[in-house]
Amino acid sequence: MTLLKRYHIYGERSSGTNFLDHSIKDNFDAINVFADDVKDVDDIIERCRKYGHKHWFGDDLDLSDTDDILFLCIVRDPIDWLRSIYRTPRNLYEPMVESQERFLFGKYASTAVFYDEKVSFKLGGYEYCNNIFEVRHIKLEWICEKLPKLVKNYMLIRYEDLKNDFQGTMKKIKDMGLIKKNDISEDIVKMKKWMKRDDLDDPIATFDFAQKDPKVKLQPTYYRPNYKPFNFSIEDYPKEFLHYEKVLGYLR
């Protein structure tokens, strides 16, 4: 087995990419090839063109000469993911969350993180699809089918497994060749304590609180949560986009 000291992560927003990256940094002597030791803007642009951003990736990448890199992909239960995205719509156009119906079945549009002529619109953060199910389906297809054929070292992780079997997941990453530190953290509570992505332990970040305090009833943005209730189940999921949810074990 070849020992690896470099890695890259792919996954949608609110799928656990930060949690996974933080866990790797705590437990392995490895460098994130996209995010670590960035020199300047030109360096970021070149890395984006070569490897892709963790959230924006696809066929436009140049993944040649990457045999010394472990590519980790993380996915999350579709309903939990939709609820989290609806709650905190990072980099989505604000009209998308005017209502649950608009969010689920209206046109999907993602705002750009940056733009440069050397990088395609898609890799810079621009995304346009018929709906949010379609964009997830396209990304899952690339993660599950295309990426494994492009790189030597590939691993797919479910957010639920990272959360519920942290030790087991870290061991699987070690078995892929990433060089571990002396001890792997056993305290999952400590590992998740810093991550307030869903604000589940914050009493003011709840729908009930929003009803009590009209000052926080604002249109949700990147920084402001959406307090509207979200009622949607896998039974309502469009059938044409269920294939990869079944492959990933999310159809019960």
What kind of region is each of these model predictions?
Residues G106-G124:
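A short, charged helix-loop
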Residues F28, P89-R90, M170, K174-G177:
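Residue-level detector of secondary-structure transition/capping positions
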Residues D62, S99, R158-D161, K172, ...:
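Short, solvent-exposed coil/turn linker segments
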Residues M1-K107, T111, Y128-M155, Y250:
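PAPS-dependent sulfotransferase catalytic domain
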Residues L150-M176:
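Phosphate-binding beta-loop-alpha motif at adenosine-nucleotide cofactor sites
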Residues I79-D80, L162, K196, L200:
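Surface-exposed, flexible loop/turn segments at secondary-structure boundaries
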Residues M1-R6, L147-P148, M176-R252:
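PAPS-dependent sulfotransferases, especially Golgi type II membrane carbohydrate sulfotransferases
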Residues D21, M170, F241:
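Generic structural marker for isolated residues within well-ordered, non-membrane alpha-helices
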